[in-house]
């Protein structure tokens, strides 16, 4: 570029920085090798599937799936991890269904969790925006998008039709929220439900409420589904749950994490340490017996879970070795060009 054009460009950039603040315009190469900050999901298996050691900060995450599949459980584990590291968490309970006893069992510090149960969708999203813009909250969870009922629908008569009202509400809210979430480095998790499209003969009839905006604005989308029931004798004690990363802007997508969600306890940390330990040759399995460093831990997975609960130092040691081997570290993760693909979007 010749000197005259460069001078003109420098003048324009100076004027823009004067009007809009420093950093309003920059060269893309200035951000080369930047670091993607992340917050652990509370599950080493899911952290590995997400590719950057957890949920990326300053991004929007959508967690969706059928009823009772474990969506809220997954989000509550993330809140517990943030609080464990001294962060601040807020929960927008649009469904008015959060169980504080269960949340506490998952490790959530309920005395320091900011909770809002809004009267209508606009109120819930305004509260979420206020938390984000404060810059003082590390994670905001909205449970759920489907329950963010527009004010006009609540005040109207039963049976009134409000075509596209919720979709317009979400679209407007996300336009306002996305920039603020990025600047404040807040992790925003939106939990969503599943609906069936009427009259679909071919292809997947499932869709998520709230229009397409959330699909576009989300950096990560997780599909949570029950795979099978877990039993002790005849008693059902939990579910084997598949969490599929269907969209990921910060790492390769389509990875799948399988975790055990136990009733009243949440994700079984012992269960995933056993599974990943065997998979990565840290835990030895011979028949039904499991061993670590030559010492037998037990026969059968449930007995080994009990052993690890009684010997937490062994569990922590295996967990640490797993994170080292898989390259999962808390906090900042280097984002190299080859690890950061272009925007990927999957239509359900």
From Swiss-Prot:
Keyword field: ATP-binding, Cytoplasm, DNA damage, DNA recombination, DNA repair, DNA-binding, Nucleotide-binding, SOS response
Intracellular or extracellular location(s): Cytoplasm
A GO molecular-function annotation: ATP hydrolysis activity
Pfam families: RecA, RecA_C
Main location: cytoplasm
Coiled-coil regions listed: none
Nucleotide-binding recorded as keyword: yes
Cited InterPro entries: AAA+_ATPase, DNA_recomb/repair_RecA, DNA_recomb/repair_RecA_CS, P-loop_NTPase, RecA-like_C, RecA-like_N, RecA_ATP-bd, RecA_C_sf
Cystine crosslinks: none
A cellular-component GO term for this protein: cytosol
BP terms from Gene Ontology: DNA recombination; DNA repair; SOS response
Positions with a binding annotation for ATP: 65-72
UniProt cross-references to Gene3D superfamilies, sorted A to Z: P-loop containing nucleotide triphosphate hydrolases (3.40.50.300)
Similarity-based family: Belongs to the RecA family.
Purpose of the protein: Can catalyze the hydrolysis of ATP in the presence of single-stranded DNA, the ATP-dependent uptake of single-stranded DNA by duplex DNA, and the ATP-dependent hybridization of homologous single-stranded DNAs. It interacts with LexA causing its activation and leading to its autocatalytic cleavage.
Name of the featured protein: Protein RecA
Organism of this sequence: Staphylococcus haemolyticus (strain JCSC1435)
């Amino acid at each position: 570029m010749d000197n005259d054009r460069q001078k003109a460009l420098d003048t324009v950039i100076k004027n823009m920085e004067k009007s809009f603040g420093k950093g309003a315009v920059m060269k893309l190469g200035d951000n080369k090798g930047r670091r993607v900050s992340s917050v652990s999901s509370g599950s080493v298996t899911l952290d590995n599937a997400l590719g950057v050691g957890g949920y990326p900060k300053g991004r929007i995450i959508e967690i969706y799936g059928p009823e009772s599949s474990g969506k809220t459980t997954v989000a509550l584990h993330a809140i517990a991890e943030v609080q464990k590291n001294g962060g601040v968490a807020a929960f927008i309970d649009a469904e008015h269904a959060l169980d504080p006893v269960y949340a506490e069992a998952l490790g959530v510090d309920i005395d320091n969790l900011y909770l809002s149960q809004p009267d209508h969708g606009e109120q819930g999203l305004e509260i979420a925006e206020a938390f984000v813009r404060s810059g003082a909250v590390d994670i905001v969870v909205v449970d759920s998008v489907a329950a963010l009922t527009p004010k006009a629908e609540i005040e109207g008569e039963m049976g009134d039709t409000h075509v596209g009202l919720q979709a317009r509400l979400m679209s407007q809210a996300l336009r306002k929220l996305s920039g603020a979430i990025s600047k404040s480095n807040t992790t925003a998790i939106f939990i969503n439900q599943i609906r069936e499209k009427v009259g679909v003969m071919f292809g997947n009839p499932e869709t998520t409420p709230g229009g397409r905006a959330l699909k576009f604005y989300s950096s990560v989308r997780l599909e949570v589904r029950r795979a099978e029931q877990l039993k002790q004798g005849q008693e059902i004690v939990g579910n084997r749950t598949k969490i599929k990363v269907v969209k990921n802007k910060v790492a390769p997508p389509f990875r799948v994490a399988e975790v055990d969600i136990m009733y009243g306890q949440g994700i079984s940390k012992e269960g995933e340490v056993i599974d990943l330990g065997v998979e990565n040759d840290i835990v030895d399995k011979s028949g039904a017996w499991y061993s670590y460093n030559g010492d037998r831990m037990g026969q059968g997975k449930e007995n080994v879970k009990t052993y690890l609960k009684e010997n937490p130092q062994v569990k922590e040691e295996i967990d640490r070795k797993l994170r080292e081997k898989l390259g999962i570290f808390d906090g900042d993760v280097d984002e190299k060009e080859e690890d950061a693909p272009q925007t990927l979007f999957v239509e359900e």
